[in-house]
């Protein structure tokens, strides 16, 4: 009984703390005046993985890795899948550069994915494969999807380029021995096992497991907004306009992908359309910055993690999108050094110190999106229920997987006020330099929710 009381007290106190430290995003007219004497040529809100953007970048300002236009695996820490009820395997591809931490369930894995060469999470449909390729093959078979190759049907499929050509990826799955009938048999077994089961409530369907599935399956949208742009009235100096314009185009694509991700969250699409628009409108900047901070953990060197060092240099690289980084010197010259340092020091470094994993990351993303304090919501109680469900899921996951770390649940949530503060500073740059189109972002979100491709049917996974 005492343990239950302790849990409730901790959850409520942290929730109240977050709510008090979570001001609403000010209206654009309140963000116009930012004292600054330095020009800015860098846009922060670039985040979710995407396929090759059709833009040309000014590489003088960016550090481009080989094949940077190809998606890479998510960074670093993965969820302790043994602690997730109903989820036996890791739900996202392994990290791009780092090994698993010693306590990770897959740290001793000796197998690589037969399709892309990433770390395999087990044998799926007859072949050792990662969760990314497993999910791709399962979705292709169950939806009976067909693909076309834009090249010569011999595209390279590795962990950085596996999303570039779906046709060649599927053909390689078959060539490596993945069996279509195994997917169909799995679905039949699942159907038999649920014949006598009671239908779950809407709240029960929202879980970390489902969010992990969405994170690994969400596709790149076919088009992007034209929300961020360098117009004739922009205050960006002429010599910086080309790289800023390129980054704006990439940023627009990332915002479009974010809308697709949000729409696929269980029951988000059942909210009033106006509520969906308001929730995305008030969280997109935070979500994109959070994704940048998450990916940038890979680029933090070991020297900066040495607590005994007294002359530790600040982090030098920020990952804007898979394979594309921005150096601190470029950020300083562009006039956004403060935002650069805050994202890495207040978010990335703290997240790495906490050893935040993928399950915690996706849960926090949903918590950021499902903010019942947004003004104008038509069905606030339903948003409250969904967000409280995510609080409970995260708290339960932390207690099971990190039971020895007292206060971890609070430590995770306390990254959110810092994220909100940084996002407001980023907004100041966007509006001060007139990088936001005159039309409200709500119209772009509305079009994306109404016109983009059908969402992922996770109920059949």
From Swiss-Prot:
SMART domains registered for this protein in UniProt: HOLI, ZnF_C4
Zinc finger residue extent: NR C4-type: 113-133, 149-173
Single GO MF annotation: nuclear steroid receptor activity
Keywords of the record: DNA-binding, Metal-binding, Nucleus, Receptor, Transcription, Transcription regulation, Zinc, Zinc-finger
DNA-binding residues (ranges): 113-185
Domain of life from the UniProt record: Eukaryota
Keyword Transcription: yes
Record region (Hinge): 185-192
Region of interest (Modulating), ranges: 1-112
Domain (NR LBD): residue spans on this chain: 203-452
Biased composition (Polar residues): 41-51
Comp. bias (Low complexity): 27-40
Positions of the UniProt region annotated as Disordered: 26-51
A Pfam family it matches: Hormone_recep
Subcellular location: Nucleus
Listed GO CC annotations: nucleus
Family stated for the protein in its record: Belongs to the nuclear hormone receptor family. NR2 subfamily.
Free-text comment on this protein's domains from its UniProt entry: Composed of three domains: a modulating N-terminal domain, a DNA-binding domain and a C-terminal ligand-binding domain.
Subunit structure: Heterodimer of USP and ECR. Only the heterodimer is capable of high-affinity binding to ecdysone.
Function: Receptor for ecdysone. May be an important modulator of insect metamorphosis.
Name of the molecule in the record: Protein ultraspiracle homolog
Name of the gene this protein is made from: USP
């Amino acid at each position: 009984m005492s343990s239950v009381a302790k849990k409730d007290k901790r959850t409520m106190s942290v929730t109240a703390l977050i709510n008090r430290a979570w001001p609403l995003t000010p209206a654009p007219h309140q963000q116009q005046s930012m004292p600054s004497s330095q020009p800015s040529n860098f846009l922060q809100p670039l985040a979710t993985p995407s396929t090759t953007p059709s833009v040309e970048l000014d590489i003088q300002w960016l550090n481009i890795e080989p094949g940077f236009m190809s998606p890479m695996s998510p960074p670093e820490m993965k969820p302790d899948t043994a602690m997730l009820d109903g989820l036996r395997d890791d739900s996202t591809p392994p990290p791009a550069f780092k090994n698993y931490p010693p306590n990770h369930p897959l740290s001793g894995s000796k197998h690589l994915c037969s399709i892309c060469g990433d770390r395999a999470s087990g044998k799926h449909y007859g072949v050792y494969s990662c969760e990314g390729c497993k999910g791709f093959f399962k979705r292709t078979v169950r939806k009976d999807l067909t693909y076309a190759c834009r090249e010569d049907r011999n595209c390279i499929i590795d962990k950085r380029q596996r999303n570039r050509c779906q046709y060649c990826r599927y053909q390689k799955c078959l060539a490596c021995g993945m069996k279509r009938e195994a997917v169909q048999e799995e679905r039949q077994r699942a159907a038999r096992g649920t014949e006598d089961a009671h239908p779950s409530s809407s709240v029960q369907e929202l879980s970390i497991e489902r969010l992990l599935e969405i994170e690994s399956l969400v596709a790149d949208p076919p088009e992007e907004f034209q929300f961020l742009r360098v117009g004739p009235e922009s205050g960006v100096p002429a010599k910086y306009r080309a790289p800023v314009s390129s980054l704006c185009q990439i940023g627009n694509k990332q915002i479009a992908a974010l809308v697709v991700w949000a729409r696929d969250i269980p029951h988000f699409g059942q909210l009033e359309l106006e509520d969906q628009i308001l929730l995305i409108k008030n969280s997109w900047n935070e979500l994109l910055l959070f994704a940048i901070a998450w990916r940038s953990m890979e680029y933090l060197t070991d020297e900066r993690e040495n607590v005994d060092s007294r002359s530790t240099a600040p982090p030098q690289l920020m990952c804007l999108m898979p394979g594309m980084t921005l150096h601190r010197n470029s950020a300083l010259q562009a006039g956004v050094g403060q935002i650069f340092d805050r994202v890495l020091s207040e978010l990335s470094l703290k997240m790495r110190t906490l050893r935040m994993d993928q399950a915690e990351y996706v849960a926090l993303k949903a918590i950021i999106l499902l903010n019942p304090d947004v003004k104008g919501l038509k069905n606030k109680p339903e948003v409250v229920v969904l967000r409280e469900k995510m609080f409970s899921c995260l708290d339960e996951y932390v207690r099971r997987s990190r039971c020895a770390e007292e206060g971890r649940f609070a430590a995770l949530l306390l990254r959110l006020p810092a994220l909100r503060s940084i996002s407001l500073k980023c907004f100041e740059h966007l509006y001060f330099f007139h990088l936001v189109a005159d039309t409200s972002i709500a119209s772009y979100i509305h079009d994306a929710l109404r016109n983009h491709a059908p969402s992922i049917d996770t109920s059949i996974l």
